[in-house]
C-alpha cells in the first residue's frame, strides 16, 4: 500500500487488476509471485474493512430503541 490511506473501493480495483493479470497467464514467474503477494495483502485489507463494517452493523437500533444483532445471512423481516 502507499502512504495514502487506501479506500475499500481502491483496494478492490487493484485486487481485480491483479487477478486479471494473473488469469491471463503470461506474467513471468517472479512477477506472478509479487502480484500474488500484493493480492493477498489487498485481500486481507478488504476483509478487515468488511469485518469492521459488519461490526458497526451488529448493533442496529430499531425504531423502538431496541438493539438487535445483525445477521448478514438473514433477510429483512
From Swiss-Prot:
- Provide the family line: Belongs to the XseB family.
Q: What is its EC number?
A: 3.1.11.6
Annotated localization: Cytoplasm
Q: Where is the signal peptide?
A: none
Q: Which reaction does it catalyse?
A: Exonucleolytic cleavage in either 5'- to 3'- or 3'- to 5'-direction to yield nucleoside 5'-phosphates
This protein's major location comes to cytoplasm
PANTHER family of this UniProt entry? EXODEOXYRIBONUCLEASE 7 SMALL SUBUNIT
Biological source species:
Lysinibacillus sphaericus (strain C3-41)
Biological role stated in the UniProt entry:
Bidirectionally degrades single-stranded DNA into large acid-insoluble oligonucleotides, which are then degraded further into small acid-soluble oligonucleotides.
Gene designation: xseB
Q: Which top EC class is given?
A: hydrolase
What name does UniProt use for this protein? Exodeoxyribonuclease 7 small subunit
Enumerate the UniProt keywords alphabetically.
Cytoplasm, Exonuclease, Hydrolase, Nuclease
State whether it acts alone or in a complex, and with which partners, per the record: Heterooligomer composed of large and small subunits.
Q: Which GO terms describe its biological process?
A: DNA catabolic process
Quick check: keyword Nuclease in the entry?
yes
- List cellular component terms (GO): cytosol; exodeoxyribonuclease VII complex
Gene Ontology terms for molecular function: exodeoxyribonuclease VII activity
